[in-house]
């Protein structure tokens, strides 16, 4: 175990949660007693056999008995010396433990430090607590270093104690009989406390281990003819799938060449649906990525039969249209041919109205440029709106060309802009920044989802590229509240932190199951790798509630792993039900247990990742201001609700370092903003 990568929450808990030095002291006392008993037995046995050999029992039988008895007496004497050495080494182990315990930071101090950090982060809306947060983090790093030093020292001393022990030699009678491990079905089976290492399959023709099925070259499969590992299904080349004929890993469905899909025959990753060529689609028959709908050619569309990106509607050809059957960019309405039109049936650019032919007309049924009114033919002003700088603007307060919305800096926008520091091109959304956005308050390119930051996101409050699920941080995610790439799970619960997961609430990659900590698990609530069973701690288990390797049986226990409070947990020191990973706990007197977490040191319910506080979070160090409650957050170091991205504080946000509500982009302190530095 690499203690240097474990935080003080785990290292301190490992030292303080055990039984302490008492059992080892008892063992030292027992070894001392055994040494005395063996020494007395050796002396007594030698005296008795000597009296027999020098007395009435003479002849060849007596001589043979004397030789065997002498050998056994020597073994008793040697065993007594070895028992005395074991007693001394047990006492040395006690001394090493007590020294390490004294050098380890108390878990209460670690918990108080983390509680102080959460309080500072929750109240740091204006950044005023930054120095205090830095100081708390510095103390935490010192705790981490102290625990690592203590554990490494303890490991070194304990290893030296173990290496100095002399192995016990078998007795003469035992040496004459065959020994070794128990053999079951031709494979070894060991029992190491609550750790089991199985090696048998519950069917025939398997090359791998721990399979519930036949003819599997891989291991821990529930099914047949799987070349990969931990699949529930048949004929999978990849690992961690629920389904059949998958070439990739972590799929829920059939015939997927890639990974993390929920559906059938997807050529790409992170899709929910079937027959998609691309990634992160929520729908079927899409040629592209990040679409919500069917038969789209392009990215970030919400609707059907769109060619292009960032459209909200159906049968659009272009970018950033809100409506149907538009040919162009940034139109709001239907059947427009051109860009930046606010209305329907327009041919041209920047018209505010319907059935206009031309540029910058404000009205209906006009033919010409800059006309204000209806049913006119001719040429009006350069701009038909007021306060414009440019040409062909029918809205107000624009700088640029062919804008039918207001306050835009750019070209061909039918939505309203944000103002300074934001530039819009071909956008139909309100207060968006970028190109071809039909989603309100979006920053980037081709976003049809609201409050998104990035490229071609068709769902709300996402940060990244080609996400069709809501509140994702990353790329090609069709599920909700995921932090990572190509995750299709998370709808109605919480997403995952990792890569290509089709299940929900996973911390890891290629998991088709849910609430796992690790990789390639098709079962649920596992801590480890390649498990097709449920609630296992270890590797390649197709049974349930196992702690170990290659087990295909179900164990009659409440948890797998160690030091849990509750039931159906895997891993280490979780309190509650259906948790995997390490030290997931409520730490709240009003909520003793937590449910459905994966990862490390999460506080709340249905969290995936590391040190999240609240409910329904994925990522690293995210929190909700009230400590408890539904957050719906993905990403890193966010505080609030419905947030994706990095270092955001508020609600309904995406992007980086924003500090108010309903914001996308970067470094914004105003509400209802997109872009940069508002």
Swiss-Prot record:
Give a GO cellular-component term: plasma membrane
Which residue spans traverse the membrane? 14-34, 180-200
**BP term (GO), one:** response to host immune response
Q: What is this protein called?
A: Uncharacterized PPE family protein PPE21
**Localization of this protein:** Cell membrane
Its family remark reads: Belongs to the mycobacterial PPE family.
Q: Name the keywords, alphabetized.
A: Cell membrane, Membrane, Transmembrane, Transmembrane helix
> From which source organism is this entry?
Mycobacterium tuberculosis (strain ATCC 25618 / H37Rv)
Q: Topology versus the membrane, per the UniProt entry?
A: Multi-pass membrane protein
Question: Its principal location?
Answer: membrane
Q: Cross-referenced PANTHER family, in alphabetical order?
A: GLUTAMINE-RICH PROTEIN 2
């Amino acid at each position: 175990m690499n203690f240097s990568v474990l935080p003080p929450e785990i290292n301190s808990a490992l030292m303080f949660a055990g039984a302490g030095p008492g059992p080892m002291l008892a063992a030292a006392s027992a070894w001392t007693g055994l040494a005395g008993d063996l020494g007395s037995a050796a002396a007594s046995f030698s005296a008795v056999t000597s009296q027999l050999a020098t007395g009435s029992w003479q002849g060849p039988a007596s001589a043979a008995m004397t030789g065997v008895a002498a050998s056994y007496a020597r073994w008793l004497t040697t065993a007594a010396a070895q028992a005395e050495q074991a007693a001394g080494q047990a006492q040395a182990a006690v001394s090493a433990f007590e020294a390490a315990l004294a050098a380890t930071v108390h878990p209460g101090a670690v918990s108080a430090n983390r509680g102080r950090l959460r309080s500072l982060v929750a109240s740091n809306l204006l950044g005023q607590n930054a120095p205090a947060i830095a100081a708390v983090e510095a103390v935490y790093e010192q705790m981490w270093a102290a625990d690592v030093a203590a554990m490494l020292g303890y490991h070194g001393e304990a290893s030296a104690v173990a290496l100095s022990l002399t192995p016990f030699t078998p007795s003469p009678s035992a040496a004459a009989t065959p020994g070794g491990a128990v053999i079951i079905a031709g494979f070894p089976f060991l029992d190491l406390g609550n750790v089991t290492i199985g090696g048998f399959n519950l069917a025939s023709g398997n090359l791998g281990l721990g399979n519930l099925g036949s003819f599997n070259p891989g291991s821990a499969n529930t099914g047949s003819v799987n070349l990969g590992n931990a699949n529930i299904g048949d004929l999978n080349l990849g690992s961690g799938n629920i389904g059949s004929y998958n070439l990739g890993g972590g799929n829920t469905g059939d015939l997927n060449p890639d990974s993390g899909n929920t559906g059938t025959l997807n050529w790409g990753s992170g899709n929910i649906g079937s027959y998609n060529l691309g990634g992160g689609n929520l729908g079927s028959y899409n040629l592209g990525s990040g679409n919500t709908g069917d038969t789209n050619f392009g990215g970030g569309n919400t609707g059907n039969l769109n060619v292009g990106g960032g459209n909200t509607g159906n049968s659009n050809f272009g970018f950033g249209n809100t409506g149907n059957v538009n040919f162009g960019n940034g139109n709001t309405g239907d059947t427009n041919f051109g860009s930046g039109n606010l209305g329907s049936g327009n041919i041209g650019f920047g018209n505010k109205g319907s059935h206009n032919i031309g540029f910058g007309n404000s009205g209906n049924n006009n033919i010409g440029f800059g006309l204000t009114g209806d049913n006119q033919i001719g040429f009006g002003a350069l701009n038909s709106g007021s306060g414009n700088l440019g040409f062909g603007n029918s809205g107000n307060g624009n700088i640029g060309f062919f804008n039918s919305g207001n306050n835009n800096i750019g070209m061909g926008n039918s939505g309203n802009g944000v103002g300074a520091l934001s530039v819009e091109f071909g956008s139909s959304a309100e207060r968006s920044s970028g190109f071809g956005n039909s989603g309100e308050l979006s920053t980037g390119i081709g976003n049809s989802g609201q409050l998104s930051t990035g490229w071609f996101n068709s769902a709300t409050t996402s940060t990244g590229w080609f996400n069709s699920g809501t509140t994702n941080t990353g790329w090609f995610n069709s599920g909700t509240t995921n932090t990572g790439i190509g995750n299709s799970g998370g709808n109605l619960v919480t997403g995952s932190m990792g890569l290509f997961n089709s299940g929900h609430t996973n911390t890891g990659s290629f998991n088709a199951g849910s609430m796992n900590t690790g990789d390639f698990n098709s079962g649920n609530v596992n801590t480890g790798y390649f498990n097709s069973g449920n609630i296992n701690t270890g590797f390649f288990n197709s049974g349930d509630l196992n702690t170990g390797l290659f087990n295909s049986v179900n164990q009659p226990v409440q948890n797998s792993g160690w030091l849990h409070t509750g039931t159906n947990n895997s891993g280490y020191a979780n309190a509650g039900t259906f948790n995997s990973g390490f030290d997931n706990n409520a730490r709240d007197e009003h909520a003793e247990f937590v449910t459905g977490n994966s990862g490390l040191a999460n506080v709340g319910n249905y969290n995936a990742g590391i040190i999240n506080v609240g409910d329904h979070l994925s990522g690293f160090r995210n929190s909700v201001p009230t400590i408890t409650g539904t957050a719906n957050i993905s990403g890193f170091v966010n505080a609030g609700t419905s947030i994706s991205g990095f270092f955001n504080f508020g609600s309904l946000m995406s992007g980086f370092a924003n500090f108010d509500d309903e914001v996308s982009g970067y470094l914004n302190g105003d509400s209802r903003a997109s872009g940069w530095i508002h």
